[in-house]
Amino acid sequence: MKVSEYATEVINSRPYKYQTRQTFFKDLKRLGIWEMEVENINSALIRDVVEKIQTQSTRKRLFITARSIFKDLGICQDLPNLEAEGKIYDIPTQAELEWLIDKSKYRLQLLLCMFGGLRVGEACAVTPEKLSGDYLDVNQAYSQDGLHLGSPKTYGKILLPHWLAEEVRNMKPNQYWKIGRTTKLVSHSCYKLSRSAKFKDMTGGKTVNPHMLRHWYATDMIRRGVNPEVVRRQMRHKNVSVTLRIYTQVRSEEIEASLPTRLDEMKKPLETPVRALRLVK
């Protein structure tokens, strides 16, 4: 039996979410085993393909796919469970991000990512009916291809800034997302605007995607000293370690500031201020 036949049967018989099923199909094709016979699949074959991929998150996901699909056959179960990679983004300033969002046709969806921490599929599924006061019930998400409206990656009620809740409350019918409309439209709009000459001049060539806005949201709360448990709830993470490990944005200058300084270097900048104080005295 070919992997395509076996995998289709397995995936459709398990209670996977729509987006998870689509990801499994895509991953099996990326691994290059879609048309192979199941009896020829083994861990060494999967490793040879995955180890050529540079992105840690992609390697991790492909190993998960192989272990999941073939677990009933006992194949690929010795593939490693890689550590999640914490991303470090060089995110533009808040003013620059808001400038970009205001230029987008999908302004409301991007605002929900930046000031509500929503994933792009969740932002597309927002309607006024999901509001209770300024609390938003995140209970649905569109799949990336736009063909399915189902459950989000994580459920939860989050508190929106009042002005943003008002924007959601006043949504017009033409702002509602519809089945068949891919959420990539939001991502492409965001990326295209960040590649414009004006934005390049403003930021020095930084690019932006909707998930970076979600990172900004978490990072901004943590930098303002918001309790990590509150951040976790607003981000709808299953545990606070995910909040701190993966979604805390650390700028390059903060890393540099954390490095120890030699005593000889510390004395130099102190000489001038000390003399100045003595003169005043």
Model region roles, listed by residue range:
Residues I91-Q94, A125-V168:
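Conserved tyrosine-mediated DNA breakage-rejoining catalytic core shared by Y-recombinases
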Residues R107-L111, F115, G121-E122, M212-K238, ...:
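C-terminal catalytic core of tyrosine-transesterase DNA break-rejoin enzymes
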Residues S151-K157, H162-L164, N170, P260-K281:
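C-terminal secondary-structure termini that scaffold catalytic or DNA-interacting sites
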